[in-house]
Amino acid sequence: MPFVFPDTTVSKDYFTDNNASGGEGGSPFDFVKLDKGAVLKKIKAWKDNWLISGVEVWMSDGSNKLVGKRGGPSGEFTFRDGELIKKLNVQASAPYSSVLKRRRLGAIWLETDKERSWGIYAHSLTEDGSYWPDVGSGICCGIFGSAGDAVDRLGFAMLQPISRAVLTDVKYPNLDMEIVASTPTTVAHQVFSNGTDLDQTFELSGSRSVTITREWSLTTSLSMTISVEVTAGIPEVVSAKTGFSWTVSSLATHSVSTSNTETKTWRWPLVCPPHSRILGEATMYADDIDTEYEADMELQLKNGKTYRYHVNGVYNGLNARSGNVKLDNLGPYTGN
């Protein structure tokens, strides 16, 4: 049977397992970064004869943690972006420590969904020390256990399977400071003639191919590892008494990143006086914006639990809107 010790600071509401494998000595530690949306990026371990003397981990938010001590033969593994743990063995050592016969951490082995594997093994391991925790979603949010001059026991905080991830409560704190596009693009230029005794109404129309983009940047690797929906309003330009300004549209569900090229068509009615020629010109604006956003990332887990953590990033978007219509009277229409 495995030699494991539960850690009550690691909630099984959010993680598949709170057991640390090894022995009962050392001082407890807890280095779990779910509240930052951070995931394990690199692990390095050192061994000394029959035990693992040190383990150091680096997280995607830039933080790191060393337990035990560096020294002796070592091995390390760096995760690629989006790479998940598929199998994990955290193995206790054989009971070789002093009179108390205490065990410590003896080996770590993992395999990923990219068919890569890594491990480090102390001497004289026994099969009864193997412990294969449920890896859940495959996302590791940190480590926990106990250590002193070596690593007594170790556990990996493996996130429960995720059913849905939603970026919600999105706010754009600097939106009122963003500049509205001021350079128009001409999309229609046409002359109309009226040789009758009555006003005539014509339609000025114009089209332009525009690439509409929306993207909420995600700065934590957890967010980049899973598929994320966004429930938010979109920054857009509206007419106000003093001109044009940015506002936020009504809530809708979006992909975290979209880019669609579409043909925008605008039509404007123009009235031409009797026996006159007029020139109609119309413009459009492409409103490009890069602005900071703040939001909550909501993880809806398959066990029915929900976890939220705060995120921030940059929203990048481009919208197209109708501009101005200019009407010039070209003088009398002579019929030529």
Where are these regions (language model features)?
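Lectin-type carbohydrate-recognition ectodomains
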Residues: 1-207, 264-276, 281-333
